[in-house]
Design a protein with these regions (language model features):
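Negatively charged
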Residues: 2-254
Length: 254
């Protein structure tokens, strides 16, 4: 018992020493360090002493250790080798930390990354997301989020379904996004009070059945009318008229 106490005291001293760093080699090791630090120092703790440069998988990182109240500092994490951030902050309802300097250039999965992060509203426009393929449900139920994302390069995106589902305050212009490789647009802006037309979006990689319920009645009538007409024109001559009519009727979730 005494040896365990001494070990804990030594660990505490090391963690409090600003020059001290620890380098986990796996996600499981990282989760253990996060869990122990939060238990010891609370949900507002500074986790920048963790060298995450060897971590490739951060999927479901906080959800799996049940740290839903976490709102600490992870702004200096080295994410240059991470390829999977799916569900990273899933359910972290209080998290609103600055992660704008993260290196996301190798990430391929961001699905559900901020799922139900109800208070998150931090700038992400400088992120390199050019290799991300899956953005599905990324900001679902991020009620506070309303940051520009117009600089994002979606050249490799395949799935943006429900990306902003129920983002009650989101209203940023995304018309210049490269969506030429996107296969699934379903519910991308559903339950969002959106006002910007998306007439420049390229639908060449999808079909009308993957464009259901794009927006809801909360969107402005002008946005709905202009966008639906532009998209309908892209489908004409490529699909059966019945499919286009179905697309028109299902464009808005009623």
């Amino acid at each position: 018992m005494l040896l365990i106490l001494i070990r804990r005291l030594r660990l505490k001293f090391k963690y409090l020493n600003e020059s001290y760093t620890v380098q986990p080699k796996t996600k499981e090791e990282l989760q253990q360090i996060i869990n122990e630090t939060i238990e010891r120092e609370g949900n507002e703790c500074d986790l920048n002493f963790i060298d995450t440069s060897k971590i490739k998988d951060m999927s479901m990182l906080f959800w799996k250790i049940d740290k839903m109240d976490f709102n600490g500092d992870i702004s200096k994490w080295d994410t240059s080798n991470v390829t999977n951030m799916a569900g990273l902050f899933w359910g972290c309802i209080r998290f609103n930390g600055d992660i704008s300097k993260w290196d996301t250039s190798k990430v391929k999965k961001m699905s559900q990354m901020f799922y139900e992060c109800k208070k998150f509203d931090q700038p992400l426009n400088d992120w390199d997301v050019s290799n991300v393929e899956d953005f599905s449900n990324m900001f679902e139920m991020c009620y506070a989020f309303d940051q520009p994302l117009n600089k994002w390069n979606l050249r490799n995106a395949r799935d943006i379904s429900a990306m902003f589902y129920d983002c009650a305050n989101f209203n940023q212009d995304l018309n210049d996004w490269d969506t030429s490789n996107v296969k699934n647009f379903v519910s991308v802006l559903n339950k969002v009070p959106y006002t910007y037309a998306l007439t420049n979006w390229d639908l060449s990689g999808t079909d009308p059945n993957h464009c259901k319920f794009i927006v809801s009645r909360r969107a402005s009538p002008e946005m709905v009318s202009e966008t639906k007409e532009a998209w309908k024109e892209q489908f004409e001559g490529k699909y059966k008229y019945s499919d286009i009519l179905k697309f028109e009727s299902n464009f808005v979730d009623r």
